[in-house]
């Protein structure tokens, strides 16, 4: 559960930095405090945010290449930043299985966007996964001749880095709560029920 929370917080952070023009470091601190996540989840969120920011050129290049019918700047904010988080995981985190990164992104798309976004995210990430598997010589159902990924997956996590501030961003002095993504009441109720069903009685996550 801590990694799901970390991904949610990373999404919220990139969303606030993107829409609210907030410094990534400030947005991350605010999101972590706002959602009261565990230290493990906060650490994972920090890795995702810093990695996505540091490798944004490569990540966005892959999004533009794979989403040929979309202008990246006009893509829905949730979709764009979900893809940034997931593609960072897929390209730069060898310790995270490709399917795990994809499935988590799909679930977050369902929570914070809709089924259409989930299908869109699945299509983009599925294509990238096929390319990465082909580059490693793994079996895939994709046809031969698929274009190679812009950057092959590395074998070690990306080095830690300080989030790169947006030169055009206006530093916030108070929490900008209007830029936080809100899940729908239906999704919130569904997720709450699912968590209650999957959480063993008397067991709390450390």
Curated annotation (Swiss-Prot):
Keyword Plastid in record: no
Pfam families cross-referenced by the UniProt entry: NusB
GO annotation terms (biological process): DNA-templated transcription termination; transcription antitermination
A GO molecular-function descriptor: RNA binding
Extent of Low complexity compositional bias: 169-180
Keywords of this entry: RNA-binding, Transcription, Transcription antitermination, Transcription regulation
InterPro entries: NusB-like_sf (IPR035926), NusB_fam (IPR011605), NusB_RsmB_TIM44 (IPR006027)
Record GO cellular component, one term: cytosol
Region annotated Disordered, chain positions: 135-206
Function summary: Involved in transcription antitermination. Required for transcription of ribosomal RNA (rRNA) genes. Binds specifically to the boxA antiterminator sequence of the ribosomal RNA (rrn) operons.
Family label: Belongs to the NusB family.
Name of the protein described by the UniProt record: Transcription antitermination protein NusB
Organism encoding this protein: Heliobacterium modesticaldum (strain ATCC 51547 / Ice1)
Protein's gene: nusB
């Amino acid at each position: 559960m801590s990694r799901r929370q970390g991904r949610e917080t990373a999404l919220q952070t990139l969303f606030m930095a993107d829409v609210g023009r907030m410094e990534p470091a400030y947005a991350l601190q605010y999101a972590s405090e706002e959602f009261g996540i565990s230290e493990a989840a906060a650490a994972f969120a920090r890795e995702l945010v810093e990695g996505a920011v540091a490798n944004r050129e490569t990540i966005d290049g892959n999004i533009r290449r794979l989403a040929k019918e979309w202008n990246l700047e006009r893509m829905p904010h949730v979709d764009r930043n979900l893809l940034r988080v997931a593609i960072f995981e897929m390209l730069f985190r060898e310790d995270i299985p490709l399917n795990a990164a994809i499935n988590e992104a799909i679930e977050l798309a369902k929570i914070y966007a809709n089924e259409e976004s989930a299908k869109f995210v699945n299509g983009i990430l599925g294509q990238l996964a096929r390319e990465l598997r082909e580059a490693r010589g793994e079996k895939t159902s994709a046809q031969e001749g698929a274009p190679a990924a812009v950057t092959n997956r590395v074998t070690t996590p990306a080095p830690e880095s300080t989030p790169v501030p947006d030169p055009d961003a206006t530093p916030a002095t108070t929490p900008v709560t209007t830029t936080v993504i809100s899940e729908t009441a239906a999704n919130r109720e569904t997720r709450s029920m699912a968590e209650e069903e999957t959480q063993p009685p008397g067991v709390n996550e450390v």
